[in-house]
Amino acid sequence: MSEMTPREIVSELDSYIIGQHKAKRAVSIALRNRWRRMQLDEALRHEVTPKNILMIGPTGVGKTEIARRLAKLANAPFIKVEATKFTEVGYVGKEVDSIIRDLTDSAIKMVRHQSIEKNRFRAEEMAEDRILDVLIPPAKNNWGQAEGTQEPSATRQAFRKKLREGQLDDKEIEIDLAASPVGVEIMAPPGMEEMTNQLQSMFQNLAGQKQKAHKVKIKDAFKLLIEEEAAKLVNPEELKQQAIEAVEQHGIVFIDEIDKICKRGESSGPDVSREGVQRDLLPLVEGCTVSTKHGMVKTDHILFIASGAFQVASPSDLIPELQGRLPIRVELQALTTEDFERILTEPSASLTEQYKALMATEGVDISFTADGIRRIAEAAWQVNESTENIGARRLHTVMERLIEDVSYDASEMNGQSVIIDADYVRSHLDELVADEDLSRFIL
């Protein structure tokens, strides 16, 4: 679990997301409260429930990006799902309980990776010993059993030194590795993925663990053996318990496009993918127990963050019970020309930096002037205003159109420089921006 302070979390998010300070503050406080809760006495800790968040804002302003970056910062089980993928229980489609199952699967992977990293040093020593056993085989007695290494310890240590210095990296050896389980492809109707996974696991377990000889270079063998030895040091039952505890105490679920499951007007017939899904989400958000293949998981202390554009519907169109379980509301603002300028230059790996790096691979030096960046931002904002406002995603379309000629000819422009200033931008974009029909279909 992350121990970062709210200020540190916001600072980290600032490196990738421009503006939206209120949303950053809300998620940073929610993330810090996870840590604060774990410092309390057990009796009080059980009573402190997470304050779920609803992020409201037009498309392309950073809602999903906040979720992506938060996943890396959280150091906790995290899953992002689309609300539109689910249907009401009893109909064809994914049930909302699969959110918790997928979250538990991701926690298993996370905890396994942490356990392997924790045991890596020991695994490296064991991998070295296995390679040395191949290079210096132990002598065998009359019954074909190993009597132990007969060579003097100095010889083994000399080979170990060479191995660690990389002198033997390119030497080929034959080692026995666990064979990959035979894949059994099972087709199942939508919503029955859990049954498919269980059947596949059953067939793989029936096949058993077999060893297979591989002829590889020592440097590749070392990596493979480390992974195999580290996996042996992991206790599967302990792994499951740690993963389930991590989900229950620190798990975060991000539900995107929640506005798409709002009921719109009066309709006859069942609302299997709208209001029905909201009703199914209620127990998860409030707290219930979900059965997974790894064990029972309680959702009482899982943090839920929902987001939606709410351009057609409004938050009040959610059923009242679900509204009450999303107490923190954060409104994200539409992006301005100034925001677009900052997006083009300030974030780590900004769009301009990406295009510079891509063209540099062909030996072409691209530079963007301040007035050129300003004009790109104005063009993107203008197209958003005159057609459909898709926020910062418009910059990708505009930049691709702007760099198209250079990108096409780059392989024949080795050693040349291209300066993208306001005049360059006008000559490539102004005609498209001015013509609403063209900008609607091209930009």
UniProtKB/Swiss-Prot annotation:
Show the SMART domains listed in the entry.
AAA, ClpB_D2-small
Q: Where does ATP bind?
A: 18, 60-65, 256, 321, 393
Q: Name one GO cellular component term.
A: HslUV protease complex
The protein's matches in Gene3D superfamilies, at most eight in alphabetical order, are given as: 1.10.8.60, DNA helicase RuvA subunit, C-terminal domain, P-loop containing nucleotide triphosphate hydrolases
Query: Its principal location?
Result: cytoplasm
Q: State the compartments where it is located.
A: Cytoplasm
- GO terms for molecular function, please? ATP binding; ATP hydrolysis activity; peptidase activity; proteasome-activating activity
Q: Which UniProt keywords apply?
A: ATP-binding, Chaperone, Cytoplasm, Nucleotide-binding
GO terms (BP aspect): protein unfolding; proteolysis involved in protein catabolic process
Query: Which family does the record claim for this protein?
Result: Belongs to the ClpX chaperone family. HslU subfamily.
The function of this protein is: ATPase subunit of a proteasome-like degradation complex; this subunit has chaperone activity. The binding of ATP and its subsequent hydrolysis by HslU are essential for unfolding of protein substrates subsequently hydrolyzed by HslV. HslU recognizes the N-terminal part of its protein substrates and unfolds these before they are guided to HslV for hydrolysis.
Subunit comment:
A double ring-shaped homohexamer of HslV is capped on each side by a ring-shaped HslU homohexamer. The assembly of the HslU/HslV complex is dependent on binding of ATP.
Q: What is this protein called?
A: ATP-dependent protease ATPase subunit HslU
Q: Which gene encodes it?
A: hslU
